[in-house]
From Swiss-Prot:
Pfam families noted in UniProt: AAA_lid_4, RuvB_C, RuvB_N
The keyword DNA-binding belongs to this UniProt entry's keyword annotation: yes
Region listing for Small ATPAse domain (RuvB-S), in residue ranges: 181-251
GO molecular function: ATP binding; ATP hydrolysis activity; four-way junction DNA binding; four-way junction helicase activity
GO CC terms of this entry: cytoplasm; Holliday junction resolvase complex
GO BP: DNA recombination; DNA repair
Lineage of the organism: Bacteria, Pseudomonadati, Thermodesulfobacteriota, Desulfuromonadia, Geobacterales
Localization: Cytoplasm
Keywords: ATP-binding, Cytoplasm, DNA damage, DNA recombination, DNA repair, DNA-binding, Hydrolase, Nucleotide-binding
The protein's name: Holliday junction branch migration complex subunit RuvB
The organism of origin for this protein: Citrifermentans bemidjiense (strain ATCC BAA-1014 / DSM 16622 / JCM 12645 / Bem)
Region Large ATPase domain (RuvB-L), annotated ranges: 1-180
CDD domains: AAA
Subunit annotation: Homohexamer. Forms an RuvA(8)-RuvB(12)-Holliday junction (HJ) complex. HJ DNA is sandwiched between 2 RuvA tetramers; dsDNA enters through RuvA and exits via RuvB. An RuvB hexamer assembles on each DNA strand where it exits the tetramer. Each RuvB hexamer is contacted by two RuvA subunits (via domain III) on 2 adjacent RuvB subunits; this complex drives branch migration. In the full resolvosome a probable DNA-RuvA(4)-RuvB(12)-RuvC(2) complex forms which resolves the HJ.
Length: 337
């Protein structure tokens, strides 16, 4: 079952192609990353050069794919999109690279999942725009260098720490994407509603924004579900009251937590005394993959002060206790003697 407020991609998000801005000037939020990219793009265009390689990292659903497409549009070049798990063999990458034209953008999503063997092929391609091809086997094998057109690699990852140092060091532009503010999300929601022909009140847009976990992908997904509710059970206009009723039906609370978020926090509080408790233990207790908890759920809980990550494990904060109407335990007092 697809988690409604998961920031992972789903079939429903194919509709987002029509919502994505095509220019940096239309892109909402991420002002620091947007400003830097705009400067570097203008400089590259002024010199008629390919843009330096770009690494975009941050939690899922914040606009990394959108920015990659905007880079290609702003540079006036084509974009070839793929993902790390799809490129299984060096030959797969070689086929992609040899089909690029001058200054094209190659977008690799989940670039941290590239195999070490594939990375070795990517190093000279990024640095020297050359492809090393081995012909033959054994002692008679020889390597020839194939020149590649100068291109821009845009890599996206939710786990920048898993990138090897040699790969990370070859990116000239590294930008971290942050969670969006409520005001930015309300603007995005209003724009999406206009594109879809929906009627939405400013208060309704802000209510959706507050519960979208700082993530545009979640905001657009919630907007489509609330639209269904407004169409069937209201007059078609998404007001604050309609949004509140629809989200209550979907079991999404005031903080944007769904059943999985509540399960994580309540497991730590009720079963493990508030923590610390290991990630694998939490995953086993709620029947979820530990990587999914770490990549998808934890960033929002940590940044909003509901969860602490310590060397001994995860700890529920006083804010988490208050959210569920519980009294946080007193911190242990150290003894002087």
């Amino acid at each position: 079952m697809t988690r409604l407020i998961s920031a992972d991609k789903s079939e429903d998000d194919l509709l987002e192609a029509s919502l994505r801005p095509r220019a940096l000037s239309d892109y909402v939020g991420q002002e620091k990353a947007k400003g830097n990219l705009g400067l570097f793009i203008d400089a590259a265009r002024g010199r008629s050069e390919a843009l330096d390689h770009v690494l975009l990292y941050g939690p899922p659903g914040l606009g990394k794919t959108t920015l990659a497409n905007i880079i290609a549009c702003e540079m006036g070049v084509n974009i070839k999109s793929t993902s790390g798990p799809v490129i299984e063999r060096p030959g797969d990458l070689a086929a992609i690279l040899t089909n690029l034209e001058a200054h094209d953008v190659l977008f690799i999503d989940e670039i941290h999942r590239l195999s070490h063997v594939v990375e070795e092929i990517l190093y000279p391609a990024m640095e020297d725009f050359q492809l090393d091809i081995i012909i033959g086997q054994g002692p008679s094998a020889r390597t020839i260098k194939l020149d590649l057109p100068k291109f821009t690699l845009v890599g996206a990852t939710t786990r920048a720490g898993l990138l090897s140092s040699p790969l990370r060091d070859r990116f000239g532009v590294i930008s971290r994407l942050e969670f969006y503010t409520h005001e930015e999300l309300a603007f995005i929601i209003t724009r999406s509603a206009r594109i879809f022909g929906m009627a939405i009140a400013p208060e309704g847009a802000m209510e959706l924004a507050r519960r979208s976990r700082g993530t545009p992908r979640i905001a657009n997904r919630l907007l489509r579900r609330v639209r269904d509710f407004a169409q069937v059970r209201a007059d078609g206009v998404i007001t604050r009251e309609v949004a509140d009723q629809a989200l209550a039906l979907l079991e999404i609370d005031d903080m944007g937590f769904d059943m999985m978020d509540r399960a994580i926090l309540l497991t730590i509080i009720d079963k493990f005394g508030g923590g610390p408790v290991g990630l694998d233990t939490i995953a086993a207790a709620i029947s979820e993959e530990s990587d999914t908890i770490e990549d998808v759920y934890e960033p929002f809980l940590i940044q909003n002060g509901f969860l602490n990550r310590t060397p001994r494990g995860r700890v529920a904060t006083a804010a988490a206790y208050r959210h569920f109407g519980r009294i946080a335990p007193e911190p242990p007092q150290g003894k002087l003697f």
